[in-house]
């Protein structure tokens, strides 16, 4: 009988620990702002949607990501603004992204002239629960997006 109690106790504690694990938020590139073209490059705003699948709030402290447009890596971006995401909630994070024509000659300009683009991001974000330790999580996302070109005449 003592072995059965020990087995049940072990099973219950394992189940409780599994329920208490943190599921990482899901980050998806949601929007590419209207490109601001310059002589040596372009600037655009990249907006991400963050979903928290947990029943407690989480904080995203920072994000580092690589951006690929139509299969071409055009650079890396950073988000340093902290974002709190409510339980089962969503939040938005944005980053100003600088594209250098010299880095990927010809490709960037041809991508920027299109209305629609395949956008892929991969990177890592740093998150934590309230009062908890920071945790590093890798992510990747893909989307087919229109550039936000603002109002059309």
Q: Which role does the model predict for each range below?
A:
Residues 41-45, 90-94, 118-120, 138-140:
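Intrinsic-disorder/low-complexity, polar/charged segments enriched in Ser/Thr/Lys/Arg/Asp/Glu/Gln
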Residues 53, 85-91, 115, 130:
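A short, structured loop/turn motif at beta-sheet edges
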Residues 101-153:
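Terminal connector regions
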Residues 26-30, 35-76, 127-129, 133-138:
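Post-signal-peptide N-terminal segment of Sec-exported extracytoplasmic proteins
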Residues 69-105:
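Intrinsically disordered, low-complexity Pro/Gly/Ser/Thr-rich segments with frequent PxxP/GP/PP motifs
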Residues 34-36, 55, 81-83, 109-111:
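Outer-membrane beta-barrel proteins
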Residues 18-19:
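N-terminal Sec signal peptide cleavage junction
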Residues 1-8:
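Bacterial N-terminal signal peptides that target proteins for export
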């Amino acid at each position: 009988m003592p072995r059965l109690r020990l087995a049940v106790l072990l099973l219950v504690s394992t189940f409780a620990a599994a329920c208490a694990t943190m599921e990482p938020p899901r980050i998806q590139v949601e929007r590419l702002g209207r490109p601001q073209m310059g002589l040596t490059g372009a600037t655009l705003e990249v907006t991400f949607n963050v979903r928290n699948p947990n029943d407690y709030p989480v904080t995203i402290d920072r994000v580092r990501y690589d951006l690929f447009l139509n299969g071409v890596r055009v650079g890396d971006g950073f988000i340093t603004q902290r974002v709190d995401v409510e339980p089962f909630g969503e939040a938005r994070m944005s980053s100003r992204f600088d594209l250098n024509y010299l880095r990927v000659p010809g490709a960037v300009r041809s991508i920027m002239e299109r209305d629609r683009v395949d956008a892929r991001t991969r990177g890592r974000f740093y998150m934590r629960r309230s009062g908890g330790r920071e945790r590093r999580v890798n992510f990747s996302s893909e989307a087919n997006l229109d550039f936000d070109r603002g109002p059309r005449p």
